[in-house]
């Protein structure tokens, strides 16, 4: 496939000669100091923002496979968007083992057409943010498909527009991010990431962010308690890195400030927020034109 005049490549195959202003390619994660006040804030927020773990059920079970791709789909009323269908079709056509975690108000609202796309399908209730879906998926895989490599992403992105099937297996890291930032602290951005060899021990090491007994129900808490801490917690027991890193002193968010350059470099996603709360970062008409050029139905 060709994107913007270049051949689209899996992220693990992007040539090291690619240069994007303000971004570092193939970045190894390292912890930065955590001030005492932030540690206190983390504890206080966990107590203040915790909610019960979401209700869930297995619709189509996980079975033993070498690798899984997890797609978290939020559809409270059970209606799939054109963007959802585009993503699901790309995953089906790529031949991956796809686990869909679908959030609706009740199990009966899970769209029946998901069965045609998903090798495994879980329903999740409205409680909890996206990390509660990740937790559910990873726990099921650790039990039913122990040792599998797992790529996870959510529906905050358009795409994928290039091959993501080997992003985890060919990565040099155990925990792989697509992009990383130093906003708040060095962290992997959680819209998409991969974990090698997911098993019970791995989940135990990651329990400080993939909460086994509760969830959080708002964006700020999910960012501060889970996204920002995920790479730090993971680095205690595994190698961690990202394909692209942006220092917050140079740019706020790689996916918002350099989206078109990333796409030209073979990056598989565009953030949906470029047409929403982050629309001030890029011209919306250009975003739509790029999506149209990529064959996306919007």
What residue spans do the PLM features occupy?
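ER/Golgi luminal nucleotide-sugar-dependent glycosyltransferases, focusing on the catalytic module
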Residues: 2-298
């Amino acid at each position: 496939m060709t994107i913007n005049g270049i051949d689209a490549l899996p992220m693990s195959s992007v040539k090291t000669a690619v240069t994007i202003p303000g971004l570092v390619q193939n970045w190894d994660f390292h912890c930065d100091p955590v001030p005492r006040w932030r540690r206190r804030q983390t504890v206080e927020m966990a107590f203040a923002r915790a909610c019960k773990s979401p209700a869930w059920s297995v619709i189509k079970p996980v079975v033993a496979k070498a690798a899984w791709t997890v797609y978290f789909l939020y559809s409270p009323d059970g209606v799939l968007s054109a963007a959802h269908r585009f993503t699901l079709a790309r995953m089906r056509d790529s031949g991956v083992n796809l686990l869909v975690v679908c959030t609706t108000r009740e199990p009966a609202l899970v769209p029946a057409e998901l069965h045609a796309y998903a090798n495994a399908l879980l329903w999740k209730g409205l409680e909890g943010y996206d990390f509660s879906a990740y937790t559910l998926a990873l726990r099921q895989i650790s039990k039913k498909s122990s040792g599998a490599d797992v790529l996870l992403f959510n529906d905050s992105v358009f795409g994928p527009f290039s091959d993501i099937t080997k992003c985890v297996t060919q990565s040099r890291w155990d925990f792989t991010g697509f992009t990383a930032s130093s906003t708040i602290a060095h962290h992997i951005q959680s819209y998409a990431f991969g974990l090698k060899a997911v098993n019970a021990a791995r989940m135990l090491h990651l329990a400080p962010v993939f909460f086994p007994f509760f969830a959080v129900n708002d964006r700020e808490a999910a960012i501060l308690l889970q996204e920002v801490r995920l790479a730090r917690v993971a680095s205690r027991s595994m190698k961690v890195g990202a394909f692209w890193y942006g220092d917050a002193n140079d740019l706020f968010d790689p996916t918002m400030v350099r989206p078109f350059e990333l796409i030209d470099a073979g990056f598989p996603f565009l953030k949906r927020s470029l047409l929403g709360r982050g629309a001030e970062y890029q011209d919306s008409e250009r975003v739509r034109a790029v999506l149209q050029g990529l064959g996306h139905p919007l």
